[in-house]
Swiss-Prot record:
It is an enzyme of class 6 (ligase). This is Proline--tRNA ligase. Pfam families: HGTP_anticodon (PF03129), tRNA-synt_2b (PF00587), tRNA_edit (PF04073). GO terms for cellular component: cytosol. HAMAP family: Pro_tRNA_synth_type1. Catalyzes the attachment of proline to tRNA(Pro) in a two-step reaction: proline is first activated by ATP to form Pro-AMP and then transferred to the acceptor end of tRNA(Pro). As ProRS can inadvertently accommodate and process non-cognate amino acids such as alanine and cysteine, to avoid such errors it has two additional distinct editing activities against alanine. One activity is designated as 'pretransfer' editing and involves the tRNA(Pro)-independent hydrolysis of activated Ala-AMP. Consists of three domains: the N-terminal catalytic domain, the editing domain and the C-terminal anticodon-binding domain. The keyword Ligase applies. Keywords: Aminoacyl-tRNA synthetase, ATP-binding, Cytoplasm, Ligase, Nucleotide-binding, Protein biosynthesis. It catalyses: tRNA(Pro) + L-proline + ATP = L-prolyl-tRNA(Pro) + AMP + diphosphate. It is found in: Cytoplasm. Its EC number is 6.1.1.15.
Length: 569
């Protein structure tokens, strides 16, 4: 019997000092989780019950899709990461350590290498493909600034799956199947989500989609088309090419014009009395690579902003940081007057929307001078990249309708890895012609422990969590308002047994606490329904409270079971 007096759920009156998001505040105060270190959390019985429900939904849908569950070691030999080339690329988030024999290991944030090692030299023929293996296990990422509770912690529970294929077409089919599977998982959890185009990050590969749950406290900006199904993370969003009806500047090609102290796009547009659309902005960054760093210049339209993830991908850097004035001077770059005409010994890239643009204004690489009448033509195609940040109000690349910006929290990510890892680790099979080929791989991750926090972010009020019936640790709480009322206690015990026998998850609050304390805990913990057994029993009435909206309803005892079967079961 699940009695509150025997159930370990230590609630707190005050939120942790560093808690700013509702999920962090309520999950900690309600006794779902407990922080034991920076980015490290224990799951208490309430949290574990929700976590198990999330895991079961994920497992059921993955099994239904034909994937097979395995359980890999939390620790991976560093040699596998060195073999794939990710050992240095991943950065400081990858926790590296040595055992007493000086052997190097990592705590796995993902398991591409370990899973590939599992099938290498065992899956040897196309006849054994496709194969999809997954696990639900702990991961570790040494975040520089763990924050937001379970949303950005260092140790987390994740479902990561990896598929192996004989060709790209078969990988594409599995990618679409996982798209449907992840959508079904999130639909079953009752979450409002969007699958969006995304950047592949350190994992790499080609096709990539993120699953974002919409939430006002989301850490990611996403662009959603108001007309079609296009949606994308701002890091990967595309738009229909912009146009401008304002008059272009007119001048001979690359005429040099004296522009004293005109260092910003706004002052440049004002000086020439033109729209900033017809200017070219230079953004200088220091690109960090494995064994070196160097300055890179990105040229974009003056009316746009640089999207740094796109810029980082364009130059294949591990990281981009701002360049100092001293570094600009040393490279011979004049801040506020940089252009690509005559630019020497510096890598540069141009946003692809500028290709073939004419009569533009750009820096002359000389203090207090700009070039007007610039035509962006006859340049190496490799210099043109997608560099700009798409914003709300821009037009959809698919249908041309307006894009709307929303906040989202990433809960899942699916990738087409292609042959990146299999080539690096020499993992091959024999195709239909007996020829050795690298596997085509897919990678599919979903944040299991993160979903607990995301569900809270998506559904709460000022009093606490609001769980739906699918994820709630208990669907119904029976609250005895006065333990000295023996008739009420007897009725509550009998009701508990009857509802439990019907398969309902019920918690009986039999604590010797004031009624107000019990109600506060119900509102904080967020079970979907509560039944209050109290004075109304004298009139054969029980109060049913729906947590969402705190809607109260008096029900006659002889109608109670029928109403509960309709509303709660």
């Amino acid at each position: 019997m699940m009695r509150f007096t025997k159930f370990y759920a230590p609630s707190l009156k005050e939120a942790p000092k560093d808690a700013s998001l509702p999920s962090h505040i309520f999950l900690t105060r309600a006794g779902f989780v407990e922080q034991i270190g920076s980015g490290l959390y224990n799951f208490l019985p309430l949290g574990k019950r929700v976590l198990d429900k999330i895991k079961n939904i994920v497992k059921e849908e993955m099994d239904k899709a034909g994937a097979q569950e395995v359980n890999l070691s939390f620790i991976t030999p560093a040699s596998l990461w060195q073999e794939s080339g990710r050992y240095n690329v991943f950065g400081k988030e990858l926790l590296r350590f040595k055992d007493r024999k000086e052997n190097e290991f990592v705590l796995g944030p993902t398991h591409e290498e370990a899973m590939l090692s599992l099938v290498k030299n065992k899956i040897t023929s196309y006849k054994q493909l496709p194969l999809h293996l997954y696990q639900i296990g702990l991961k570790f990422r040494d975040e520089a600034r763990p924050r937001f509770g379970l949303l950005r912690c260092r140790e987390f529970l994740m479902k990561d799956g990896y598929s192996f294929h004989a060709n790209e077409e078969d990988l594409g089919r599995e990618f679409e199947l996982m798209y449907k599977t992840y959508s079904q998982i999130l639909q079953r959890m009752g979450l409002d989500f969007r699958a969006v185009e995304a950047d592949s990050g350190a994992i790499g590969g080609s096709g990539s989609k993120e699953f974002m749950v919409l939430a006002k406290n989301g850490e990611d900006d996403i662009l959603i088309c108001e007309n079609c199904d296009y949606a994308a993370n701002v890091e990967a969003a595309k738009r229909a090419k912009k146009t401008c009806q304002d008059e272009r500047p007119e001048a001979n090609y690359a005429s040099k014009f004296h522009t004293p102290n005109i260092k910003t796009i706004d002052s440049l547009a004002q000086f020439f009395k033109i729209n900033a659309f017809y200017t070219i902005k230079a953004v200088v960054k220091k690109a960090i690579y494995e064994n070196e760093s160097k300055l890179v210049v990105f040229f974009i339209r003056g009316s746009d902003d640089l999207q740094e993830v796109k810029a980082q991908n364009a130059c294949s850097a591990l990281e981009l940081v701002d360049a100092s004035e001293e570094e600009l001077e040393k490279a011979g770059l004049v801040a506020g007057f940089i252009g690509f005409v005559g630019l020497k010994d510096i890598d540069f890239y141009i946003d692809f929307e500028l290709e073939n643009e004419k009569q533009m204004i750009m820096g002359a690489n000389e203090k207090d001078y700009h070039l007007i009448g610039i035509d962006v033509v006859n340049l190496n195609k490799d210099r043109f990249k997608d560099l700009i940040e798409v914003k709300e109000g821009d037009c959809c690349v698919k249908c041309g309708a307006k894009l709307k910006q929303s906040k989202g929290i990433e809960v899942g990510h699916i990738f087409k890895l292609g042959q990146k890892y299999s080539k690096a680790m020499n993992a091959n099979f024999l195709d239909e012609n007996g020829k050795s080929q690298p596997f085509y791989m897919g990678c599919y991750g979903i944040g299991v422990s993160r979903l607990l926090a995301v569900a809270t972010e998506a559904s709460h009020d000022e009093k606490g969590c609001i769980w739906n019936k699918t994820l709630a640790p208990f669907v119904l709480e029976i609250i005895v308002s006065n333990l000295k009322d023996e008739k009420a206690l007897e009725f509550a015990n009998k009701l508990y047994e009857d509802l439990t026998n019907l398969g309902l998850e019920v918690l009986l609050d039999d604590r010797n606490e004031r009624f107000g304390v019990k109600m506060n805990d119900f509102e904080l913990m967020g079970f979907p329904y509560a039944l209050v057994v109290g004075k109304g029993l004298e009139k054969n009435e029980i109060e049913l409270i729906q947590r969402e909206g705190l809607i109260k309803e008096l029900i006659k005892t002889d109608e109670l079971m029928e109403i509960l079967k309709k509303k709660v079961l």
